[in-house]
Design a protein with these regions (language model features):
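N-terminal Rossmann-like NAD(P)+-binding domain of SDR-like oxidoreductases, especially those catalyzing
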Residues: 1-77
């Protein structure tokens, strides 16, 4: 089963990408700081991590804990 990271996955477009990936059978991790999205938008089958893509320590930890096949960078600002 592929594993995907979606940054900005709590936003409008990101949440739809997450839903499609879950429907395709992916394990999905969402990284979002909720500055433009809402946690309620995140598919409950996905793992949600609240944080910023600018936090290099957090991003390094996430990549150390998961072996991603795909990364969808949809975070903005």
């Amino acid at each position: 089963m592929p594993t995907s990271l979606v940054t900005g996955g709590a936003g409008f477009i990101g949440a739809h990408v997450v839903n499609d990936l879950v429907a395709l059978g992916h394990d999905v991790v969402v990284l979002d700081d909720l500055s433009g999205g809402f946690e309620d938008n995140v598919n409950p089958a996905a793992t949600f991590i609240e944080g910023s893509v600018t936090d290099h320590v957090l991003v390094s930890r996430i990549f150390g804990e998961h072996d991603f096949d795909y990364v969808y960078h949809l975070a903005a600002y």
